[in-house]
Amino acid sequence: MKDGGGAACELVASNLADKNIRLIGGGLPYVMKGKLVVGDGTDAGAQYLQIDPGVTIYSDSVAGEGASTDLDYVIVPVYSKMLANGAPGAPVTFTTSREVRTSGSSDSSTLNDNITADWGGLVFNGLAYQNKCNFADLGSAACTASGEGASGTYGGTNDADNSGNMFYTVVKYAGRKFNAEDELNGIAFQAVGNKTELDYIQTMNTSDDGIEFFGGSVNAKHLFVVGASDDSIDWTDGWRGKVQHAIIWQRYDSTNQTYSIDRSIEADNYGSDMDRGATNSFGAPLLFSYPKFANLTIVGDTLATNDKTGTAILLREGTGFDGNNMVVALDPHGCLDVDDDTTYDFNGDGTGEDYLSFKKAFWSCSSLTLTTEDGSGPTIAQTETMMTKNGSAAGTNSLTGYCNGANENAVVADDLSADSFFDATAHIGACSGSSADWTANWAVDPSN
């Protein structure tokens, strides 16, 4: 077909509903035509979408924030898989038509750093455990949840569920906010299991969150989240995955003089009354969110003095968090806000198992913490004590971009390789120096 003056291959719903599809690289780009669902959400109707290195897939329309019509997005329902097989120098790219169509097209308006929500993003639905279930026993067939943006149901009893893989994949200008309670992200992983493989993934300029985890146990390495309009990485509903090598870049909106992002990390669990002993109405114990991060760096563009005050990391609703070998460098923002007593109680404070901890964290913000958003939770002094245990400390960062300088590299990293998921690293943060920048040759440079 001809598309805005250039040729492209169409992807329509009927292509993916009942057959396996491979998108071949080295040729034309592909254009999304509406809501694309891989398979029919049943075991018998499972399909896969395989994408070769170097393939570009772009939206047919650029409806914009709030619009519910003309929405292009991809859903991988339970049982089906996406196999996005990008490679160094040849990533798989999902983007807006603005970037692909010729200047003669009606929606070829110039891209800029503040554009988001041109298309709906990617949604993966899995069969792993999640805790948003108050009407059936946890993990039973009836214990499922419905995704936002009419993205289907998810949840089950298989933490080893497999939704495919994403390697060297870039997702740009995606997401959609229909209203405050109904949103699509750059990528949503909904009860996705830990047999799914995620490595070298970038989201850029996404509406709502860059990446959000709704329960599940999926793990990821080499995440690069730039310029989300809400949070960069968000989790809720009992996510228990692991992440290593992650960069969050909070982009500054010079027009509105605010970050384009709300927080670098916003972490939830189930509700403000959630605690480790919580049960559903059937008396079944509820899972709580408890991810483990290592080698995370959070940075941002230079700010104007009238930028809104916020924090890099917000932990609330009884989430756990195991943060290791981290660098958090934002100014004039605070580094951490812990809300709700049930969240702080996970810190253990020497009285029990420590589900909320920071080990070898390097904090470089105008303040370590701010007062709690909702008035509950620990005092500033309690939070700062927690933040500076286990070899963690505040200091002046010497970063070049998101890569370490002498101050960060002076910290001796903890070795986490006893857990087979984690690589052994000698450095804290995501990148030991410019010569070790793992975003080169596949991701979009946010400084350009």
Protein language model annotation of sequence segments:
Residues 57:
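Active/ligand-binding-proximal structured segments within catalytic/core domains
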Residues 1-46, 60-81, 86-87, 91-208, ...:
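Extracellular beta-rich repeat passengers
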